[in-house]
Amino acid sequence: MKRFLPLATVAVTFILSFTVLATPPTTEAALADRILGDPNAPVTIVEYSSLTCSHCRKFHVETLPNLKKTYIDTGKVKLIYRDFPFDQLGLMAAVMARCAMSDRYFAFIEVLYEQQSNWSRSKTPFEALVKIGKLGGLNPADFEACLKNEALVDGLVKKRLDGQKNFDVNATPTFIIDGDHKIIGAEPYEEFDKILAKKVK
């Protein structure tokens, strides 16, 4: 266990949403937690995932849509996404997503997971990521600058180490629910529902 909207639909939505190139956020802003849902939701899921992890893709494509519909979009649960890259390519993709403006973050990782087999297996993965970044409004020069930002790269690595230290995360995806439940792997929606249904009562 390193552990779809149809792809065309996702790509078109991505392009139409972000046609204007934007200045990347500061390092501090780039490293801030990315929260899906209402920040004040009573229940918190912390997700540790790698953008090159096939099981993480499975969760985002098959399970997350149902979690969003039932719990996240209804204000009952928020999901905090934390990068846990296992390899240099996963780290590179994480840097790219973090260099997008925060309101574009989940759109970026949605496309990265949907197209994972394309860019992660490409003979020229950097160029493949650059193309995705351009579709999302990230200037290639800014992407390269972000990759050279040692504070950003080191900060992402530190988040992985913090996950290992604080929650004994050693595989992706790993989910910590309110600090007292752990789910490891791309478990189906029903496994999350068993825990969340009790917490939101």
Predicted regions and their residues:
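Short clusters of hydrophobic/aromatic residues that line enzyme substrate/ligand-binding pockets
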Residues: I35-L36, W119, I183
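Structural alpha/beta surface segment adjacent to cysteine/selenocysteine redox centers
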Residues: L51, R57-K134, N139
